[in-house]
Amino acid sequence: MLADVFEKIMGD
């Protein structure tokens, strides 16, 4: 979901 994508771009 969207949250997963944000976590990937954040890296942590």
UniProtKB/Swiss-Prot annotation:
Phylogenetic placement of the source organism: Eukaryota, Metazoa, Chordata, Craniata, Vertebrata
Organism: Agalychnis spurrelli (Gliding leaf frog)
Location (main, coarse): secreted
GO cellular-component term (any): extracellular region
Function (record text): Possesses weak insulin-releasing activity.
Name the UniProt record assigns to this protein: Insulinotropic peptide 2
Keyword annotations of the record: Secreted
Highest rank taxon of the organism: Eukaryota
Coiled coil: none
Localization (cell): Secreted
Tissue and organ expression note: Expressed by the skin glands.
The keyword Secreted belongs to this UniProt entry's keyword annotation: yes
